[in-house]
């Protein structure tokens, strides 16, 4: 207990002032609709397009100085199930040294990405980050729940645009 308290006193005494965080620019795609003009574009390609536009508009920022891309994505399944932030960053041409992190807070996933980026910069852990969000409900996959018995031929298919919880019978 004494060691922990002493350690806490050292940590508290060495904390630095929180950094002020600024939003430099914001870019977005048009708002789409289910099955609309954006329906044939993969979420990682869609996000990469927006990141490229952001970089082009802010060409004085060295892309090597970007430390992380945090993307909010509520429906992490199908094509965007493997860290869509990292995939989009690479597809946008960012260096492989730029990290990517995908967060999920359902409808507030993009907002969570902004909050996480803000907190990281405010704490002094990074200087330049990209916060973003992406979703394509038109491309959300259909799923089949696990069969109750082996070789069951009564498979049901569910649309994931309604969320995952609805197929749970509890």
What are the residue ranges of the model-derived segments?
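Short, Lys/Arg-enriched N-terminal segments with co-localized hydrophobic residues
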Residues: 1-17
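Acyl-thioester C-C bond-transforming condensing/cleaving domain
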Residues: 17-19, 33-63, 78-82, 89-170
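A residue-level signal for beta-strand positions that form part of recognition/binding surfaces
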Residues: 20-21, 68
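Residue-level signature of catalytic and energy-coupling elements of molecular machines
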Residues: 24, 66, 110
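Residue-level detector of conserved, well-ordered beta-strand and adjacent loop positions
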Residues: 24-25, 104
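Short polar catalytic/cofactor-binding loops
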Residues: 26-31
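Short glycine-rich phosphate-binding loop at a beta-alpha junction
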Residues: 65-72, 130
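A glycine-/small-polar-enriched, mobile loop at the entrance of the PLP active site in fold-type I
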Residues: 71-79
């Amino acid at each position: 207990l004494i060691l922990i308290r002493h350690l806490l006193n050292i940590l508290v005494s060495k904390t630095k002032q929180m950094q002020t965080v600024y939003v430099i620019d914001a870019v977005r795609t048009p708002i789409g609709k289910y099955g609309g003009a954006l329906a044939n574009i993969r979420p990682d390609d869609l996000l990469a397009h927006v990141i490229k536009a952001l970089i082009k508009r802010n060409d004085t920022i060295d892309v090597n100085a970007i430390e992380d891309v945090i993307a909010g994505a509520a429906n992490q399944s199908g094509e965007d199930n493997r860290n869509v932030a990292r995939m989009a960053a690479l597809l946008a041409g960012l260096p492989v040294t730029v990290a990517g992190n995908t967060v999920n807070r359902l409808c507030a996933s993009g907002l969570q990405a902004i909050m996480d980026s803000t907190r990281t910069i405010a704490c002094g852990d990074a200087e330049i980050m990209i916060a973003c969000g992406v979703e394509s409900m038109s491309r959300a996959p259909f799923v089949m729940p696990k069969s109750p018995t082996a070789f069951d031929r009564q498979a049901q298919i569910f649309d994931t645009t309604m969320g995952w919880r609805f197929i749970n019978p509890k």
